[in-house]
Amino acid sequence: MTTIQFIQGIDEEVTPEVRLTRSRSGNQGTATLIFEDPKALGQDVTQEITGMYMIDEEGQITSRDVKARFVNGQPKFLEGLYVMKTKQEWERFMRFMESYAKEHDLGFKKAKA
């Protein structure tokens, strides 16, 4: 099963908006995953958010760069940033996203240039 967690052991049920950037050389890139009203920010959750864990059959990709965005003083969004510094990290992330998209019936839309 392919899943994303903010608290290890608790799968996030909200589907994120994913934004990708890539350097001209193709060797570096970033992925920003934005979750609106995620389970991890629910009132019944008492555990601490320790990172963003992207888990699939190959293993786990981890990012510690997670921020909450607030609306009217209440947590509304979680934003995870994953920085890819090599072509291998980019390819690994893309394999994760392919698997995640397939399991969650998601599509891919290329940005307009």
Swiss-Prot record:
InterPro entries: Psb28_c1_sf (IPR038676), PSII_Psb28_class-1 (IPR005610)
Coiled coil start-end: none
HAMAP family with a match to the protein in the record: PSII_Psb28
Organism of provenance: Trichodesmium erythraeum (strain IMS101)
Record keywords: Membrane, Photosynthesis, Photosystem II, Thylakoid
Cellular location(s): Cellular thylakoid membrane
First-listed, main subcellular location of the protein, grouped into a coarse class: membrane
Gene name of the record: psb28
Its membrane topology: Peripheral membrane protein
Assembly and interaction partners: Part of the photosystem II complex.
Family as reported in the entry's similarity comment: Belongs to the Psb28 family.
Hydrolase in keyword set: no
Biological process annotations from GO: photosynthesis
Listed name of the protein: Photosystem II reaction center Psb28 protein
Any one cellular-component term (Gene Ontology): plasma membrane-derived thylakoid membrane
Iron-sulfur recorded as keyword: no
